[in-house]
A protein has these predicted regions:
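Short, compositionally biased P/S/T/A/G/V-rich stretches that sit at domain boundaries
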Residues: 11-44, 56-58
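Short, aromatic- and glycine-rich surface loops/edge beta-strands on solvent-exposed regions
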Residues: 103-116
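Edge beta-strands of extracellular beta-sandwich domains
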Residues: 117-128
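Serine-dependent carboxylesterase/thioesterase catalytic core
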Residues: 131-133, 137, 196-291
């Protein structure tokens, strides 16, 4: 996003507006990853990006030291900007710089100027990449189901402990402003409820292009969560990781009394972990899961598929079960979140 109307905002370094030597800034472009192909809108806090400023004529080497750069954060304009540095590198009639911005909450503006202060209408704007974790509970989790609950299992035993891990990460590895988690009932991840319960919340955070989605679902929440991965992908969101904890929903009876999809899920994901509960001795919750129909996906499709001797209700134990060397689902989820936020593009 550049200045609104170049003719209204041309910045002149000379006091003589009629002089042939007058030089002024026409526009600023960026950020670019490397070359001047297409600027990107969403950036990582952990990388430098290229910016270019263009003038009405070739900038002389002697004038380069007069060129300054500044930044303002979020909704602040140039009056609240901070000076960054002077100069840059001459390149094909423009001046190139590389800047890393790590402060701010959601966005920042880069200014280039020749006068004493930045011009409020000559800037380019960028936004920080964001990531969201959707924790989706099963029957009776977020609200009562058939006279039982709510148990809040996925929130108390999975979401809250994971969010606590997020909060202790070093700032140079993960900025808390870039992560958000949402607690959902399985029925909130169903058909037209997705727009009001999920899409509306995601729209408050970032556009699909600047957002990665992580889905963690238990029981019916795993079944609907797997469907959700396909639905959100169709809406241009990126599904970074899908974690299904003993997903349930294959039997016809449960589809008649629950807001779940009848067809088997066609999941779309970058990485999928499926954990199936198979206790040696069944308890009440295991019989309920059996009646609902435990989903056993094709074992070749998930990146990790393990069977554990935990009861269906023990989502926390499933989530922290070692599945890849010394790593559990929580570790892998954290790694994917950090990898996305740390990637340059």
């Amino acid at each position: 996003l550049n200045g609104e109307d170049d003719s209204d905002v041309l910045e002149n370094v000379s006091t003589n507006s009629n002089s042939d030597n007058d030089i002024y800034i026409i526009k600023i472009e960026g950020p670019f990853v490397n070359s001047k192909t297409n600027p990107i809108k969403y950036v990582s806090r952990f990388h430098k990006y290229r910016y270019y400023v263009y003038f009405n004529r070739q900038l002389k080497q002697s004038e380069l030291k007069s060129l300054k750069w500044a930044v303002s954060f979020d909704d602040n304009d140039s009056t609240s900007s901070f000076f960054l540095f002077s100069s840059g590198t001459l390149e094909n009639g423009a001046v190139r710089v590389e800047i890393k911005i790590s402060e701010g909450i959601n966005s920042f503006r880069i200014y280039s100027y020749l006068g004493g202060v930045p011009n409020n209408k000559i800037y380019t704007e960028a936004f920080f990449k964001k990531t969201v974790a959707l924790f989706i509970g099963g029957a009776g989790d977020k609200e009562a189901y058939a006279g039982t609950g709510p148990t809040n299992i996925i929130q108390l035993e999975v979401q809250n402990p994971f969010d606590s891990i997020i909060t202790i990460q070093p700032q140079e590895q993960l900025n808390l402003n870039d992560y958000k988690s949402l607690y959902l009932g399985y029925n909130e991840a169903y058909k037209n409820k997705i727009a009001s319960n999920i899409i509306s919340e995601l729209n408050k955070i970032a556009e699909p292009k600047g957002l990665s989605i992580n889905i963690i679902g238990h029981s019916l929440g795993g079944w609907n969560g797997a469907h959700l991965s396909q639905i959100l992908t169709r809406s241009k969101y990126k599904i970074e990781i899908l974690i299904t904890l003993d997903p349930v929903g294959t039997k016809e009876g449960v589809t008649l009394v629950s807001d779940i999809y009848r067809p088997y899920p066609y999941s779309i994901y970058k990485y999928w972990i499926n954990i199936q509960s198979s206790p040696t001795q069944y308890e009440a919750d295991d019989y309920i899961a059996w009646l609902g129909g435990q989903w056993e996906p094709d074992k070749e499709k998930p990146n990790n598929y393990i069977i554990v001797d935990y009861h269906h209700r023990e989502a926390s134990k499933m989530f922290t079960e070692k599945i890849a060397g010394n790593f559990d689902s929580s570790d892998i989820l954290l790694a994917h979140i950090q990898s996305y936020l740390n990637a340059k593009i």
